[in-house]
């Protein structure tokens, strides 16, 4: 290639990389591709990319040389060391103002570090969350870019051309914030995804083991739920899974081992919440539910040792299914309320000016948690951009309050039947705790002060003053120096 022709380049031709490259080219942007295993480049150029505006490079030097300036390079390689290694190989080949874009599932602290490093070399960096899986990459993903602000105007037209669209035609891509903001928001998205899936599984379990419903009956329930306030991608595919049979007519969902896998992004979200002191209880329970499912053999053994087994439901099944619908929706509100609390805390910690309504819009299409519900979140932040918690918005306050009785009936019935509802239950516990003007933490502080002299605050004194009681008469007045009010 004698003169640079490609608007953008992409490194990493696994399925996600191929699909994203095809998406970019289909929107009118000539693109160069490279892969460490060069045979993949040839196979792609001579296969899915044949006859299209692609340039397949066999070396990084050739790849970089094929790009128009400022060069824009998407890296779709395995998160972790591989990203750092690729950056080190690319930096010497680039010039001031060129842009590196990490489109993988990188941990946001790594993106913060990489942004600082790349900027120190006179280059620009973007860490962008990409949601929607392989199909989304091809047809339109949800994109959550963050990093060097100066890079956004250079890539905005490409990103907003290839991303998904809301039903109103708005692009599901907007600038999130500096350094690691984009990957942080994608991490929270993944955590919410964990919670949504676990809550759906809990309603399925209550219908399956509690009500004794067939997969066909549950398929019909989820079909109906997807027409209303629960309309979402995950409800839609739950419906499809419950109705799916293999070539022998067997219901596939019943053949799948009940031991869940995970890639770690849910854990990252929970750890981030702990670091910021945020009560991300529902998503934490979703992560631990997967951990518990993974000890399959232990559970099977315990089921033979610990009685009684799950009881059968007696009562009005149709009414209970309606209660489940209400409990799922109310719990979903709590899950998003917690996720947004975490993003607000991170915004303060890392000095990100996050657009919370804009984030809801970005999630409205193309991504795994896309749902009609997100439109209501966007409206909530339009009403009040400084909204502290979704539970305080008039729409969501009414939505939860009107479902409280049904929500509580579901939790009680689950406990009576012996069917675990960790996420639905933790959502209700958070709701009750958040609306309590007094919690038993006063006793907790007294106990901490008793055994560790950690001190406490008093209700009759200004906040921030520390007090210690010599509870036994033998402890003296020395207090813990590690306590932070």
Residue ranges of predicted features:
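NAD(P)+-binding Rossmann beta1-loop-alpha1 motif at the extreme N-terminus of oxidoreductases
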Residues: 1-71, 94-97, 133-137
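Rossmann-fold dinucleotide-binding core
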Residues: 8, 83-86, 101, 107-220, ...
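Glycine/threonine-rich flexible loop motifs
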Residues: 72-89, 104
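Interdomain hinge/lid region at the active-site interface
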Residues: 183, 208-213, 220, 228-298, ...
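Small-residue-rich helix-loop
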Residues: 224, 348-380
């Amino acid at each position: 290639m004698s003169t640079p022709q490609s608007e953008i380049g992409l490194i990493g031709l696994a399925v996600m990389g191929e699909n994203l490259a095809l998406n970019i080219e289909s929107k009118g942007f000539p693109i160069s591709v490279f892969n460490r295993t060069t045979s993949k480049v040839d196979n792609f150029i001579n296969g899915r990319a044949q006859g299209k505006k692609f340039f397949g490079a066999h070396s990084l030097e050739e790849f970089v040389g094929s790009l128009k300036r400022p060069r824009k390079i998407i890296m779709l390689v395995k998160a972790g060391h591989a990203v750092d290694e690729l950056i080190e190989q690319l930096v010497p080949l680039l010039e001031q103002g060129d842009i590196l874009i990490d489109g993988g599932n990188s941990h946001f602290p790594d993106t913060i570090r990489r942004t600082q490093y790349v900027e120190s070399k006179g280059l620009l960096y973007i860490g962008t969350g990409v949601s929607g899986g392989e199909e989304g990459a091809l047809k339109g993903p949800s994109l959550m870019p963050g990093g060097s602000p100066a890079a956004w105007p250079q890539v905005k037209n490409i990103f907003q051309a290839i991303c998904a669209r809301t039903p109103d035609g708005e692009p599901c891509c907007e600038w999130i914030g500096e350094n690691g903001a984009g990957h942080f928001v994608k991490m929270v998205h993944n955590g919410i995804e964990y919670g949504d899936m676990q809550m759906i599984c809990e309603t399925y379990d209550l219908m399956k083991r509690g009500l004794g419903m067939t997969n066909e009956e549950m398929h019909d329930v989820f079909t109906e739920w997807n027409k209303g306030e629960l309309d979402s991608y995950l409800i839609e595919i739950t419906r499809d899974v419950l109705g799916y049979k293999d070539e022998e007519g067997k219901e596939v969902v019943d053949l799948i081992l009940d031991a869940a896998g995970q890639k770690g992004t849910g854990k990252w979200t929970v750890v981030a919440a702990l670091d910021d002191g945020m009560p991300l209880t529902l998503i934490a329970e979703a992560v631990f539910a997967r951990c518990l499912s993974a000890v399959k053999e232990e559970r099977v053994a315990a089921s033979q040792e610990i009685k009684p087994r799950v009881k059968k439901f007696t009562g009005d099944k149709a009414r209970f299914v309606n209660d489940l619908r209400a409990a799922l929706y109310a719990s979903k509100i709590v899950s998003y309320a917690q996720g947004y609390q975490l993003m607000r805390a991170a915004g303060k910690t890392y000095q990100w000016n996050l657009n919370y309504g804009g984030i809801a819009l970005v999630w409205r299409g193309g991504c795994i948690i896309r749902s009609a519900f997100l439109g209501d979140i966007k409206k909530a932040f339009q009403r009040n951009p400084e909204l502290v918690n979704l539970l305080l918005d008039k729409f969501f306050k009414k939505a939860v309050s009107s479902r409280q009785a049904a929500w509580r009936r579901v939790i009680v019935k689950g406990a009576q039947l012996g069917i675990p509802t960790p996420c639905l239950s933790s959502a209700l516990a958070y709701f009750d705790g958040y609306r309590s003007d007094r919690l038993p933490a006063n006793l907790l502080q007294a106990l901490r002060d008793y055994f560790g002299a950690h001190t406490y605050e008093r209700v009759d004194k200004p906040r921030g003053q520390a007090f210690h009681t010599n509870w036994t008469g033998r402890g003296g007045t020395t207090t813990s120096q590690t306590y932070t009010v």
